[in-house]
């Protein structure tokens, strides 16, 4: 007896959107704690061969980016499932790092992709508080506890230490991209792939 009914192919789909990290009480951010359940559920379907993940994120916390990336890789390995990534408006910086958990990455011709780098930003308020007559008093135990205090002049050793941390994070990011994309990378140094540039 022949069956004329074809089995439906099931491909679970998850959407990961927003700035990566804990954004605050009234603003939702994307972190592993908030995405763990839905990711686990997507990989829990029986007899699936693929899981599709859409990403729309400009990046954010390098820690949460790597945690989400690692969790997707872990689930894919445990369930022996391939991951297909779809970049929406933007998959940049940490958003691109998460994308590297995919076996394949697809992007629209207008999607913003890349920004493989690390950035830190701050302000200096020393002259401002002096101008308005505010005296700031800080007491610390540990000479480096007030590193990069925005209310005093920058110290060269503080900036150097921050730069070293950034270089370590950047190196880790590059390793993830190289391990994921492999032969798909065309002369990274020549094409500015790891300079923080985006396309």
What are the language-model segments listed below?
Residues 84-92, 191-197:
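Glycine-rich beta-to-alpha transition loops that act as phosphate-gripper elements at the mouths
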Residues 173-199:
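Secondary-structure end/capping motifs
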């Amino acid at each position: 007896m022949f069956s004329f009914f074809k089995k439906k192919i099931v491909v679970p789909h998850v959407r990961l959107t927003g700035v990566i990290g804990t954004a605050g009480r009234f603003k939702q951010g994307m972190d592993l704690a908030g995405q763990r359940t839905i990711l686990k559920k997507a990989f829990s379907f029986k007899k699936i061969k693929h899981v599709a993940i859409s990403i729309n994120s400009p990046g954010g916390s390098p820690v949460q980016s790597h945690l989400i990336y690692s969790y997707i890789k872990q689930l894919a390995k445990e369930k022996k499932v391939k991951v297909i990534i779809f970049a929406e408006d933007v998959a940049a910086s940490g958003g691109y790092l998460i994308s590297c958990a995919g076996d394949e990455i697809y992007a629209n011709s207008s999607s913003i992709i890349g920004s493989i780098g690390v950035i830190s930003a701050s302000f200096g308020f020393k002259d401002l508080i002096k101008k308005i007559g505010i005296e700031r008093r800080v007491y610390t135990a540990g000479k480096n506890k007030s590193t990069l205090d925005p209310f005093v002049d920058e110290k060269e050793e503080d900036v150097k230490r921050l730069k070293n941390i950034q270089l370590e994070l950047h190196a880790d990011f590059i390793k993830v991209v190289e391990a994921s994309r492999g032969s798909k990378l065309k002369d990274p140094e020549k094409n500015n792939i790891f300079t923080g540039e985006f396309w």
